[in-house]
Amino acid sequence: MTTGPTGALLVVGDVVTDIVARHRGPLAPGTDTAAVIRTVPGGAGANVACWAAHWGCADVRLLGRVGADAAAWHERELVASGVRPRLVVDPEAATGTVICLVDTGASAERTFLTDSGAALRLGPEDWSDSLLDGVVQLHLSGYLLFSGPSRAFVATAVESARARGVPVSLDPASAGFLVELGVDRFLALVEGVDVLLPSRDEACLLTGLPDPADAAAKLSRHVPLVVTKQGAEGALLAHSGTVHAHVPAEPATPRDTTGAGDAFTGAFLATLLTGADPEKAAREGCRAGAQAVERVGGRPPGRE
């Protein structure tokens, strides 16, 4: 775990309620499937912020949009995790909800059913340049690219960050939603982003290449630094069209892979803010990812 980062990390992204259903083996269509079900706070943006705070970043801020139904609960949970939340309460939409179906077999693989609710209604009117006061890194959840208002928000935030010289990182977030958005459109929307943190599937989808190393290299011609998260196969770092490092994964016994990529991203950014090089930051990301898969839900353990 890292300590002593200077300056704040501002994360902008989704804050949702996760309903995690852990079942063993295939679902039984038309009848009952036994499961262990829990309701926990989630959202890719919120998870990244919590893991960054857990990994030693002393000033983590989160901007997100929620419904009045769960705003107070989410704010309490974020504060308890060491995050400074700025939650916009939507007067019409409910807080986003995600049903996470987790197969408790060896891979602990998960499938998401997503009702974005208020999360993707963040718009340019929710942005203020003052949000960057004291901020040395802006991180955007890729889910923001999957609705019109939040796409406009991303353009406004990136323009503001570039004007201030604040680096911007982005996690594509969802291979399924990327297919709907379109590769060319996504690449145009991330113009101006400094660090891209795709999963292996997302990197291959964005380039049309089957090999993740080739995909990372190609993406790094569009974005200065690409960090491809590969789960049990670690991470790849590429820039200027070349893969420069392969960081191995930490051993883990998976219970639930929900939020593993968010844990990687949070720890990676927290470490990067200490002045560490990207390879060391990726090693810390792999450590956090290993911790995450051994827990249920996408958040780190609570503070003592």
Residue ranges and their predicted role:
Residues 130-131, 188-189, 219:
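Structural alpha-helical scaffold elements that stabilize or flank donor/cofactor-binding regions
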Residues 137-214, 233-235:
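Conserved beta-alpha-beta core of the PfkB/ribokinase-like small-molecule kinase fold
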Residues 14-15, 143, 263:
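Active-site metal-binding loops of divalent metal-dependent hydrolases
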Residues 133-134, 191-192, 222:
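Alpha-helix C-terminal capping/helix-to-coil transition sites in glycosyltransferase folds
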Residues 29-34, 54-140:
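Conserved N-terminal subdomain of the carbohydrate kinase-like
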Residues 1-10, 159-163, 210-304:
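Conserved phosphate-binding/catalytic region of the ribokinase-like
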Residues 1-61, 70-73, 253-254:
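Glycine-rich phosphate/adenosyl-contacting loop at the front of the ribokinase-like
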